[in-house]
């Protein structure tokens, strides 16, 4: 199936080949764990078990940042696992969320009552909290503060629906914007990045909001089937009486109009994303931050004006994902990627769409931040004969390439709520 998908995109197959035979390690070098303590090795094992996609880019980070971000992720994964567990009563869950940051300093605290699939991070929380306390104090301070603020925010939305667009921003801030703020503060604390990266919380927040809104928009049907609703009522109520009505065939035109309005809302974060990424100096941090963002941009382009969002899963191609991962290693390339997908959306804007003028306006704003005539060499300048040869080689060796690393599949399905 992946081979068939590549027929119309031979440059993507070329990049699949490059990725499989060594390109992956250039973007995400393999981490040497031989010198780690047993408890830290356990933490990295949990990291790989709970999110292979994040594990790959976290383990590629330089120096002290690697362990700090690993522990940061696991602490928030434990907090998120508590929040997601519907078998825990609200009365019991609220104090747990409010006090979770204090458990970082209690060596024996663990939670054995979760039924969630990632419950090992709660059941063996003493191992995670031990490594948290082994971090430099400057990292502990950031992680504990973000954990405290996120726990308060999660508790607020336990029995509360997302009503207005302002509430949507607030919810996304608690579950993702704070992550962006925390990561930025860790980058600056490590001194691999300038203090401004950690101080500009508005743009760090936008990085998280853009990813979270993309997930929420793309996952409409999955969330509906799971009894979850994250689309803001202020928007969808202008089209239907119940959010679930968008899944009905007779409402598909209204559904797509609402979809386009929410995508237009999310696009407003891209100028902040460009500014944020342009400030980064460390290559491992840049890769860590840029790859999820370009994946999200490609995902929004795939979702825009697309009825499939309300009928099944919308995914970017594996070859497309690999190409993005290998290209998004510098700012000119990232700008070229953004330019490409903004043009793709722009040319698909229906004149009859209620949000069409707003969509065109924000894309015009984004264009002003990008280089003129952006074009990725890797996507444009391979000769047809050369690419045809690659495709012929593909037909003979595809079985070998089906062993492509699972990390690409995880990135295609970017993010978790």
Curated annotation (Swiss-Prot):
InterPro entries, per the entry: Isoprenoid_synthase_dom_sf, Squ/phyt_synthse, Squal_synth-like, Squalene/phytoene_synthase_CS, Trans_IPPS_euk-type, Trans_IPPS_HH
Primary localization: endoplasmic reticulum
Location relative to the cell: Endoplasmic reticulum membrane
Highest taxon listed in the record's lineage: Eukaryota
EC numbers on record: 2.5.1.21
Transmembrane segments: 284-304, 384-404
Xref: Pfam families: SQS_PSY
Expressed in which tissues: Widely expressed.
GO biological process: cholesterol biosynthetic process; farnesyl diphosphate metabolic process; steroid biosynthetic process
Annotated membrane topology: Multi-pass membrane protein
Disease: Squalene synthase deficiency: An autosomal recessive disorder characterized by profound developmental delay, brain abnormalities, 2/3 syndactyly of the toes, facial dysmorphisms, low total and LDL-cholesterol, and abnormal urine organic acids.
Family stated for the protein in its record: Belongs to the phytoene/squalene synthase family.
Function: Catalyzes the condensation of 2 farnesyl pyrophosphate (FPP) moieties to form squalene. Proceeds in two distinct steps. In the first half-reaction, two molecules of FPP react to form the stable presqualene diphosphate intermediate (PSQPP), with concomitant release of a proton and a molecule of inorganic diphosphate. In the second half-reaction, PSQPP undergoes heterolysis, isomerization, and reduction with NADPH or NADH to form squalene. It is the first committed enzyme of the sterol biosynthesis pathway.
UniProt xrefs under PANTHER family: FARNESYL-DIPHOSPHATE FARNESYLTRANSFERASE, SQUALENE SYNTHASE
Protein name as it appears in the record: Squalene synthase
Native organism taxonomy: Eukaryota, Metazoa, Chordata, Craniata, Vertebrata
């Amino acid at each position: 199936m992946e081979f068939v998908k590549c027929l119309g995109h031979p440059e993507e197959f070329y990049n699949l080949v490059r990725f499989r035979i060594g390109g992956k390690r250039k973007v995400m070098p393999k981490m040497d764990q031989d010198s780690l303590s047993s408890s830290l090795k356990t933490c990295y094992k949990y990291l790989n078990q709970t999110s292979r996609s994040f594990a790959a880019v976290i383990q590629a980070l330089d120096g002290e940042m690697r362990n700090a971000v690993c522990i940061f992720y696991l602490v928030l994964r434990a907090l998120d696992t508590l929040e997601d567990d519907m078998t825990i009563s609200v009365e019991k869950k609220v104090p747990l969320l409010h006090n979770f940051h204090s458990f970082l300093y209690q060596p024996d605290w663990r939670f054995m009552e979760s039924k969630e699939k990632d419950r090992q991070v709660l059941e063996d929380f003493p191992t995670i909290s031990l490594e948290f306390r082994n971090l430099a104090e400057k990292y502990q301070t950031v992680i504990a503060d973000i954990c405290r603020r996120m726990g308060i925010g999660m508790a607020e939305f336990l029995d509360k629906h997302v009503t207005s667009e302002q509430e949507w921003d607030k919810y996304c801030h608690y579950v993702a914007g704070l992550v962006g703020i925390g990561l930025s503060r860790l980058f600056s604390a490590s001194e691999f990045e300038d203090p401004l990266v950690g101080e500009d919380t508005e743009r760090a927040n936008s990085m998280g909001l853009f990813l979270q809104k993309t997930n929420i928009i793309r996952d409409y049907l999955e969330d509906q089937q799971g009894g979850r609703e994250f689309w803001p009522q202020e928007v969808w109520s202008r089209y239907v009486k119940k959010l679930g009505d968008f899944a009905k065939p007779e409402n598909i035109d209204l559904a797509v109009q609402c979809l386009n309005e929410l995508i237009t809302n999310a696009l407003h974060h891209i100028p902040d994303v460009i500014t944020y990424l342009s400030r980064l100096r460390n290559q491992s941090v840049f890769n860590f931050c840029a790859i999820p963002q370009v994946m999200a941009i490609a995902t929004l382009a795939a979702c825009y004006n697309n009825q499939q969002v309300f009928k099944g899963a919308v995914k970017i191609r594996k070859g497309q994902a690999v190409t993005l991962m290998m290209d998004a290693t510098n700012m000119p390339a990232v700008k070229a990627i953004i330019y490409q997908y903004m043009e793709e959306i722009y040319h698909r804007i229906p004149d009859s769409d209620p949000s069409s003028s707003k969509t065109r306006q924000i894309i015009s704003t984004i264009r002003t931040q990008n280089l003129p005539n952006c074009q990725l060499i890797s996507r444009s300048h391979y000769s047809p004969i050369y690419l045809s040869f690659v495709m012929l080689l593909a037909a003979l060796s595809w079985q070998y390439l089906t062993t492509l690393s699972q990390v690409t599949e995880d990135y295609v399905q970017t993010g978790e709520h």
